[in-house]
Amino acid sequence: MRYLILSDIHANGAAFSAVMNSTRRKRWDKAICLGDIVGYAAEVNQTVDRLRAIKPLIVIRGNHDKVCSGVEGDERLAKFSRFARTAAEWTARKLTRANRRYLSTLPKGPKMVDGAFAIAHGSPLDEDAYIFSDLDALRVFRSTDFPICFIGHSHFPVVFSWDGSEVQMQIATPPEFRLQLDPNKRYLINPGSVGQPRDRCPLSSFATYNSETRLLRIHRVRYDIAATQASIMSAGLPAPLAERLSVGR
């Protein structure tokens, strides 16, 4: 089966549109979203509505989805950065009742998909924890048994592989990263962020994966950054949330 893997859209409507438009040239059978549909940018309900319209679709929750929908409150919100907190509070006010309910009922990862791979927002051991390094990945590999897990949260496109003795880290460099997955290795794969890339490349990032051929691709797509920046500023959200999009940080 051919999968479209999205993560960390963060209410960036222009980026989401660019990604979905680009996938018209890439055949896929099922879409996966690794969470953080909202937060940071201003196209809140438009983004949730568009995601919900995709069929077939499997979605798990992210930390921003939890906070903005009220699943987690002030204690979790206090751990956000100042700008993220401001955006989360604004987002919570803007969500429609239907979309707030939708976000609040999203399942927690890790979750198996078609017996082919697992999905999680952050670490499979803790949905709010980041996987940045080979040591972070090693802890997960030693504590789990899935062959492949797609993760998000860090906004950094990267592949960690483990052959049972050593973890290798491969940064997914633009414009397209391709990897034939080895059946004798295990993988943690981050497709990067649709809406707020942080690898110093402003291009929107997502993945496609063919479970039959075991071919992984991480794609980069240009989008109208200025349009997203304008909507963020027009909403009265913090300027750094707009400015960072130009540099992919």
Predicted regions and their residues:
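Active-site environment of divalent metal-dependent phosphoester hydrolases
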Residues: 10-15, 39-41, 64-69, 111-112, ...
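Active-site-proximal beta-strand elements of phosphoester/diester hydrolases
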Residues: 2-10, 116-123, 188-192
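Conserved beta-strand scaffold positions in the cores of enzyme catalytic domains, especially
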Residues: 5, 59, 149, 188-190, ...
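His/acidic metal-ligating clusters that form di-metal
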Residues: 26-27, 93-162, 249
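Acidic, His/Gly-rich catalytic cores of divalent-metal-dependent hydrolytic chemistry
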Residues: 164-249
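Short, well-ordered secondary-structure micro-motifs
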Residues: 70-72, 130, 160-163, 229-231
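Core catalytic region of metal-dependent phosphoesterases/phosphodiesterases
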Residues: 2-100, 104
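Short, conserved loop/helix-junction motifs that constitute active-site signature segments
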Residues: 52-54, 141-143, 181-182, 209
